[in-house]
């Protein structure tokens, strides 16, 4: 069983895995539209974390992890708990960056618009302000944003995720007092 990470699963890998591959999925875009009251925010003052939205022609880069043989259910149970804040699972096709590896199916956690923590679209300035001010049991929301942006930049320098990098720029400007 393979699991696709496109948010904190890229940079906060606190579960065992047998193998990992960088690659992408299609027909989605990554957006900071999911609220977090259990990791990067608190009830009444949620942080914002990424989910995926359907986007014909879109693509999202990330990392696929092969769960250890014999421990798939144990690790999946842990990931179900970690991703509990409104995420459901579906299966999609993963395209490895290394084109010598054929595409294959991966499990995907996605926060849909009908879950109670879904915040939806907002002006980038408003999302940046919310990320700048939010913190929760797992730390500041800014850490989540910066770790994700740094990871994508290192893993896939050619990925110009405009939503992600625009938010990073806006939040850094706030930190610098601009």
Curated annotation (Swiss-Prot):
Monomer. The keyword Signal does not apply. It is an enzyme of class 4 (lyase). It comes from the Eukaryota. Belongs to the gamma-glutamylcyclotransferase family. ChaC subfamily. It is found in: Cytoplasm, Cytosol. One of its GO terms (cellular component) is cytosol. Substrate binds at residues 3-8. One of its GO terms (molecular function) is glutathione specific gamma-glutamylcyclotransferase activity. The active site is at 83 (proton acceptor). GO terms for biological process: glutathione catabolic process. Coiled coil: none annotated. Keywords: Cytoplasm, Lyase. Catalyzes the cleavage of glutathione into 5-oxo-L-proline and a Cys-Gly dipeptide. Acts specifically on glutathione, but not on other gamma-glutamyl peptides. It catalyses: glutathione = L-cysteinylglycine + 5-oxo-L-proline. Its EC number is 4.3.2.7. This is Putative glutathione-specific gamma-glutamylcyclotransferase 2. Pfam families: ChaC. InterPro entries: ChaC (IPR006840), GGCT-like (IPR013024), GGCT-like_sf (IPR036568).
